[in-house]
Design a protein with these regions (language model features):
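Short acidic/His/Gly/Ser-rich catalytic and metal-binding motifs that mark active-site loops
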Residues: 175-176, 297, 334-336, 430-432
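SAM-dependent methyltransferase catalytic-core segment centered on the flexible catalytic loop
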Residues: 228-247, 251, 295-393, 398-405, ...
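Generic, well-ordered alpha-helical scaffold segments in large soluble proteins
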Residues: 95, 104, 108, 127, ...
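Sequence-level detector for compositionally biased, low-complexity segments
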Residues: 285, 337-339, 364, 383-541
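Charged, often flexible domain-edge or linker segments that flank or initiate folded functional domains
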Residues: 1-137, 186-317, 420-424, 442, ...
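Glycine- and acidic
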Residues: 82-87, 145-154, 176-189, 214-220, ...
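Class I S-adenosyl-L-methionine
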Residues: 110-118, 122-208, 515-516, 530, ...
């Protein structure tokens, strides 16, 4: 064995070499700090894009102004009548910045040129004088290059998902924080998604003798986010490969209200289908950019040119007989400050249904929380499946024992045949020992509320009240332990359910005793001690 040769490096040269190597590693692999720096630039550039678009719209009779007005009309029809001009400008700014990102992430898929919403927006941008907006492109070129570098060579779908979610997270939290706050955006852990999908499939078979894969079973995820539910439905094999093309083209439906999330969902679903079937790339026809809650509200006015193809998809979905609804509804419950111009929207028909059911049966004085997004989602889905079907959501679990929710709990019993509630706990609006007992938050830092998976089964032939099946995941469990338990059950059929007997007050757990009613009321006609009362603390009067 000869002597090993050494290398004589100049220390300064060695430093340069080390820096170059590190730069290459960062370029190829990316790191969180690096992406957050880009996000700050993106936020500023998005603002500048919005200012430029506003300036272009100040020419009242220009072609650009006419095209934008048409677009705004379309957005209001597809999303919500209360969408402002500023909201539409923000959407266009998002589109300008993200189009090249998707082109970089999914080279060879021609996604942005085939997606109906992307096409409509690109038409507006072409008219609005793209030159005026292209000045920022050079600044962003480095960012797009980093996305291309990071995505190149990643064929593993989980790796690509990770990049997309990181991008989405960083982009939203920094560039559009108000939107994150308004919509309560959080991601659904795959373990929970798989549990919900397998439970829906098992419940369909047990109660209706069909499966998710069967023809004429239409499946809808009304709040698809980045498309995790449809993607996992494609990936898990619940739909056999020979049945997948038909299901994908005709019976799988997804809605999303946030433009960027809609783009990501469409790409994710399309990529999953392409990968699993090995067929040519094919745009997913079942995804709609829309406000799900707005879909059943009365429509006014004529058809327009704003987003025609998207509107057509929305009409087609409304005509479908949807029997399975799964997903993770938005969590937003209002806002901290009434002046931040970010109020949650109103839906007269949907809210009227809540007033006639959940609120009508509630004994609470303040019923505002019955109009939280996730409660609206239950009302909307219960009505959408008509007289028969399945709803399975993961939501805030506060309704299980909240005082205001007594009317909601009563209505679930009245409208369904079976109600399954898997309480994952995690209420971090508690402290000390109680907080430790509640355990980890399954949504990570995305949510501090307790979380529950609820499976609702509605049958035409059912008489009487629903059977209530309940399972508490247990005390002192970490997030990872909870997800492991959910995963090990596989579906609702393996969960050791306990049957609950609600009392006359519609308490399901932690039932109150009747002793309290023996006390003399301070204010409760006609035997009250005091004749008048007001909500003084809330009204400051």
């Amino acid at each position: 064995g000869g002597e090993q040769l050494g290398f004589a490096f100049d220390p300064e040269e060695l430093g340069k070499w080390q820096d170059a190597m590190f730069a290459k590693i960062v370029t190829k692999c990316g790191n969180r700090r690096y992406w957050e720096d880009w996000a700050k630039d993106i936020a500023e550039i998005a603002d500048r894009h919005q200012m430029r678009i506003r300036a272009l719209l100040e020419k009242p009779y220009s072609k650009g102004k006419k095209a934008f007005d048409e677009f705004l009309k379309g957005v209001r029809k597809n999303l919500n009548p209360s969408v402002s001009q500023n909201d539409a400008i923000e959407m266009l700014a998002q589109h300008i910045i993200t189009k090249p990102v998707f082109d970089a992430l999914f080279e060879g898929y021609a996604f942005t040129s085939k997606n109906p919403v992307s096409q409509s927006m690109q038409k507006i941008m072409d008219i609005l004088d793209a030159q005026a907006l292209d000045k920022e492109h050079e600044t962003l070129e480095g960012f797009y290059a980093s996305v291309r570098e990071r995505a190149s060579g990643i064929t593993d779908p989980k790796g690509r998902q990770k990049i997309i979610i990181e991008l989405y997270d960083k982009f939203f939290k920094t560039a559009f924080p108000r939107m994150v706050e308004r919509l309560g955006i959080v991601y659904t852990p795959v373990e929970i998604v798989d549990f919900i999908l397998h439970s829906a499939d098992a419940a369909l078979q047990a109660h209706f003798g069909t499966r998710l894969a069967d023809q004429n079973v239409h499946i809808l995820d009304p709040f698809t986010g980045t498309g995790t539910f449809p993607v996992r439905l494609i990936e898990t094999g619940l739909i056999p490969p020979e049945k997948l093309p038909y299901k994908y083209r005709h019976e799988l439906h997804a809605n999303e209200i946030v433009l960027l999330a809609y783009y990501i969902a469409a790409i994710n679903i399309e990529e999953a289908f392409h990968r699993v079937t090995g067929l040519e790339y094919e745009p997913f026809p079942g995804i709609v950019l829309t406000d799900t809650f707005q879909m059943n509200e009365p429509q006014t006015g004529d058809l327009y040119e704003g987003l025609p193809e998207n509107h057509k998809r929305s009409d087609e979905q409304k005509a479908r007989d949807i029997r399975v609804i799964v997903g993770n509804p938005p969590y937003s419950v209002g806002q901290d400050n009434a002046n931040d111009n970010n109020q949650n929207l109103k839906y007269p028909r949907l809210d009227g249904r809540i007033a006639a059911t959940y609120a009508a049966h509630s004994t609470a004085t303040n019923k505002n929380s019955l109009y939280d997004s996730y409660i609206r989602a239950f009302r909307w889905a219960s009505d959408r499946i008509k007289d028969e079907g399945i709803v399975c959501f993961v939501t805030n679990g506060g309704w299980i024992d909240g005082n205001t929710m007594d009317g909601f709990r009563k209505t679930l019993q009245d409208e369904f045949a079976d109600v399954y509630v898997f309480n994952l706990r995690g209420n971090q609006r508690t402290s000390g020992e109680l907080s430790r007992k509640e355990g980890g938050k399954v949504f990570g830092s995305g949510s501090r509320t307790p979380v529950a998976i609820t499976l609702l089964i509605k049958r035409k032939d059912h008489q009487g009240k629903a059977a209530i099946h309940y399972h508490d995941i247990g005390d002192y469990l970490s997030r990872e332990q909870k997800l492991e338990i959910v995963s090990s059950f596989g579906s609702y059929q393996q969960v050791p359910w306990q049957t609950l007997e609600p009392n006359e007050y519609h308490d399901w757990i932690n039932q109150r005793s009747g002793d309290f009613n023996a006390f003399v009321p301070l204010n409760d006609e006609p035997d009250a001690i005091f004749a008048f009362r007001s909500r003084g603390v809330e009204t400051s009067r």
